[in-house]
Amino acid sequence: MNRLLPCLLILLLSGCVRLPGPGPAVTYHVLTDPGPVAMSPSTHPGILLVREMDAPALYQAASPVYSREAGTRSYYQYARWSEPPAKRLTWLLRQRLEAARVFAVVSPLGAGVRGDYQLNTRLVD
């Protein structure tokens, strides 16, 4: 009986413990370019190489960053980027430049193409 009482007490108390349920759903955000493309009045005859955008380490994470007061940054807990912002913004920029026909050819840097111009960009906050 002395052994049975602690076991029953543990069994009863374990029924009071609430197991965590599924957490909030994670939301994925995709950066898009909804604006219309303005055509260039003239196309430059060169090849433009677009280097992947530089970004501080804070903005290379999978979670979006927010700030509630100056000098502080935090990550959203239940939100994610579909891909790193710098990579996605570089792709959107390249698509926009190709569609606007500013240069005869727009190519990513490192694609094995010899270019006449190189565009370097940086993400700043």
Predicted features and spans:
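Surface-exposed short loop/turn segments
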Residues: 17-39, 75, 95, 99-125
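Residue-level marker of positions within ordered structural domains that often coincide
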Residues: 6, 55, 98
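C-terminal motif of bacterial Sec signal peptides marking the signal peptidase cleavage site
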Residues: 12-15
